[in-house]
Amino acid sequence: MVNSVVFFDITVDGKPLGRISIKLFADKILKTAENFRALSTGEKGFRYKGSCFHRIIPGFMCQGGDFTRHNGTGDKSIYGEKFDDENLIRKHTGSGILSMANAGPNTNGSQFFICAAKTEWLDGKHVAFGKVKERVNIVEAMEHFGYRNSKTSKKITIADCGQF
């Protein structure tokens, strides 16, 4: 299986911040990577485009992917509402690691987070399935709009997304 690369064009209150590209580890974590890839392209009729990063904690992570309710309470995968943890072999080794947000074991949907630092306490609990390939500095810039309480000071949006 080929490791796909997807992109997010990020805006802050409607103004362009930049494009990040993300390599998905489909060779080891196929189902999770395919869910994220398809939600990036919109080929199943729903997608990340227009959704926001609703939770940003500086020094920890930037979380997004709720394209149904846009507030962190919605979750929808290409497989239905939730799907099982595929495997937990990849580690949260540092900034740029892409991982599934969940509400416990086997509750993956559309929400994801991008690590801003090493987060080893998440190993074995969240499926890490990709890594920012280019422009991790955009993720670092996004951190400036977050607070320790996880709120954001500005609207951080995925203005466009797709697959290279």
From Swiss-Prot:
It is found in: Cytoplasm. It comes from Homo sapiens. It comes from the Eukaryota. PPIases accelerate the folding of proteins. It catalyzes the cis-trans isomerization of proline imidic peptide bonds in oligopeptides. This is Peptidyl-prolyl cis-trans isomerase A-like 4A. GO terms for molecular function: cyclosporin A binding; peptidyl-prolyl cis-trans isomerase activity. Its main location: cytoplasm. Pfam families: Pro_isomerase (PF00160). Highly expressed in brain, ovary and mammary gland. Moderately expressed in lung, salivary gland, kidney, skin, adipose tissue, intestine and spleen. Weakly expressed in skeletal muscle, liver and stomach. Expressed in pleiomorphic and undifferentiated liposarcomas, osteosarcomas and breast carcinomas. GO terms for biological process: protein folding.
